[in-house]
Amino acid sequence: MPVSYDFVILLALFIVLARSHPLPEETAGDASNKCTLSEEDLSNLKSAIYSAASAKSSETAILSNDTLTACPMLSNFTEMLKTVATDMEVLKTQGVSNAEVELLRESFEEKLNELAKNKDIFERQAGQEASKTEGAMVEKINQLQLQMTKLQEEIEQQTKQMYADMIEYVFQRLKTNDTDAIDSYAQILFKAKMHDLFMKLKTDRWVLWNMLNYVEQKKDKLVGKRVLNTVINQVISLNRSNPDELEIGKHSLVNLLCWTSTAKTVYGAVQEDQKMFYLTKLYFPAEKGCTECKDVTSRTLCSNTYPKSIAKAYG
């Protein structure tokens, strides 16, 4: 079930409320310090939230300096909307089609609609003055705060599960080398969860190899360089005294050597090469000067002898 536009708009509003700075205490008797929002202020806020809901952040000032001075809780509103715009991009473009996620989305939409009908900060009740006082804003935000905090936590958990489902889906598809089926999810994960993705993929050398070949097909130098450095850094972080991690590191390193030696696109530079040579020394110390280089050769999934040559020279 696709995320409705109304749901996205409402979610943008309430994420902003949930992330707002704590409201300062009102100074009794000092009416000049009251936080009031004019119709223009309200219009600007609504326009900015609509933009954020469309995954577009505004670089221009949303509220005047006078308004921000009187309403310091809104001083970081532009930065919050940039964050919200990113959240909206995630919710509008990402998701896994399964019943559990669909039910969660329906539940969130229902809860948000119920809250919006009763507590809409941008609509005045009949007879209310043209501007909203800070007291009225405090009352509305306080009434929503506990509910929205809980709901936001649920949304965060849903998002984590969505990413986990994407990673598992990509992993299973790569097992059969079905790269056409992973394209949309892979592009999302490359931007948002590359480390987590390769933490999963590196547990199976064939799956990792299929992904590296998929990256090569895309011929995106920036993505390729990020992938290369992500896997290198993960190999560096492994505990070589742990047999399972040692095996993962060896397979991952040989895959990288195969990939960089057969790729038509150059992703790394001298720095990446030096790291891989150093890792070869750490992971294949017995291969230096080898003739058959059985350990490296047994892990080589490409048709060339580059991994063997590197192990012989640097092991």
Curated annotation (Swiss-Prot):
Domain of life according to the entry: Eukaryota
Keyword Coiled coil in annotation: yes
Induction, per UniProt: (Microbial infection) Up-regulated in salivary glands following duck Tembusu virus infection.
Disruption phenotype: (Microbial infection) RNAi-mediated knockdown results in reduced replication of duck Tembusu virus in salivary gland after an infectious blood meal. Reduced release of duck Tembusu virus in saliva. Up-regulation of antimicrobial peptides in response to duck Tembusu virus infection. Increased expression of macroglobulin complement-related factor.
Keyword DNA damage found: no
Coiled-coil parts of chain: 98-161
Record's keyword terms, sorted: Coiled coil, Signal
Signal sequence bounds: 1-20
Cysteines joined through disulfide linkages: none
Function text: (Microbial infection) Modulates replication of duck Tembusu virus in salivary glands and virus release into the saliva, probably via the regulation of antimicrobial peptides expression in response to duck Tembusu virus infection.
Name of the protein described by the UniProt record: Salivary protein SG34
Source organism (scientific name): Aedes albopictus (Asian tiger mosquito)
